[in-house]
Amino acid sequence: MLNQIKQDAQDRMTKSIDALRNSLASVRTGRASPSLLDGIKIKAYGTDTPLNQVASISVSEGRSLVITVFDKNMSKDVEKAIYASDLGLTPTVVGTLIRLNLPPLTEERRKELTKVVHSEGEDTKVAIRNIRRDANQQIKDMLKSKEITEDEVRHGEEDIQKLTDKAIKSVDEVVKSKEQELMTV
């Protein structure tokens, strides 16, 4: 039972870190990346559809993205969705091709994005600490119901703390890496 609590905590911490990585992938750096457009949804076929399901996205020349829309009737919808997103990009439409040129980030915008990255990292750390708290509470509940001894509680809490420290270190590395990527001109 104790091992199951540890495994559950580790799985939840890993999912939190993965969610942070996915979230940071959509933060715009100076380089073009198809993941930049992951959050864009298009009204297609009666529902909100992710852009990557109605078009292919590729990188061209490092600082531009080329979107090839599968259905040429959807080009206008894709263009509107890009304008509506908060990415600040201006699409150039030529038939089923949409080109997005990414202007270099200003120093001010880089600093703003660094703050956003740092904030998301802190939110993830809070989530990890909450997972630790939940796991420790489950361990204490097991002690109350006399399923485990005091020594097992102490060892269990130490193991959970080690998992937490490892996860927080991983979050710090992810955030630092993204901040370096942002500050590289």
From Swiss-Prot:
TM spans (from-to)? none
Gene Ontology biological process terms, A to Z: cytoplasmic translational termination
Could you tell me which InterPro entries the record lists for this protein?
Ribosome_recyc_fac, Ribosome_recyc_fac_dom, RRF_sf
Compartments reported by the entry: Cytoplasm
Return the similarity comment. Answer: Belongs to the RRF family.
Q: Which purpose does this protein serve, as stated in its record?
A: Responsible for the release of ribosomes from messenger RNA at the termination of protein biosynthesis. May increase the efficiency of translation by recycling ribosomes from one round of translation to another.
Q: What is this protein called?
A: Ribosome-recycling factor
Gene from which the chain derives: frr
